[in-house]
Amino acid sequence: MFRGVTHLNLDAKGRMAFPSRYRDRLMGLCDGEVVATIDYESPCLMLYPLPDWEVLERDLVKLPSLNPQARRLQRLLIGHAHDLQLDGSGRVLLPQPLRDYANLDKKIVLVGQVHRFELWDAEAWEQARTDWLDEARQDGVPDELGSLTL
């Protein structure tokens, strides 16, 4: 399970070091094999342990090819997917096209989302988080969440 928000830095070569608390889990789950792709709704990347990505990819491929929305989703998620491998220091090299999409430069934020991670530019993350908090205050709690105890 991946959770928490971690502020990190990209090195000059575009490598990101996974925090040590995630490395052993990633090595156990997928031998350090991770897939990165774009988030089509937000300016960030999504990083999946390889087995979780393979399940998602199978589901994406099963979508009807004559459905324009399904084809668009397949093109965006599968088309931008890159296989990454943790090196001996727990780092992955993020391909330039993915860094460009998410505007990743030096300061980045890794956000655990249980079975995957999101990777954000630090400024974009701060702005999005502020916007989400403002929206949550204005919108209130959806009915579906009314029974949760936080």
UniProtKB/Swiss-Prot annotation:
Cellular component terms (Gene Ontology): cytoplasm; nucleoid
Gene3D superfamilies: Transcriptional regulator MraZ domain
InterPro entries: MraZ (IPR003444), MraZ_C (IPR035644), MraZ_dom (IPR020603), MraZ_N (IPR035642), MraZ_sf (IPR038619), SpoVT-AbrB_dom (IPR007159), SpoVT-AbrB_sf (IPR037914)
Pfam families: MraZ
Keywords: Cytoplasm, DNA-binding, Repeat, Transcription, Transcription regulation
Gene Ontology biological-process annotations: negative regulation of DNA-templated transcription initiation
Cell compartment(s), UniProt: Cytoplasm, Nucleoid
Record-annotated SpoVT-AbrB domain positions: 5-52, 81-124
Family statement drawn from the similarity comment of this UniProt entry: Belongs to the MraZ family.
Name by which UniProt lists this protein: Transcriptional regulator MraZ
Protein source organism: Alkalilimnicola ehrlichii (strain ATCC BAA-1101 / DSM 17681 / MLHE-1)
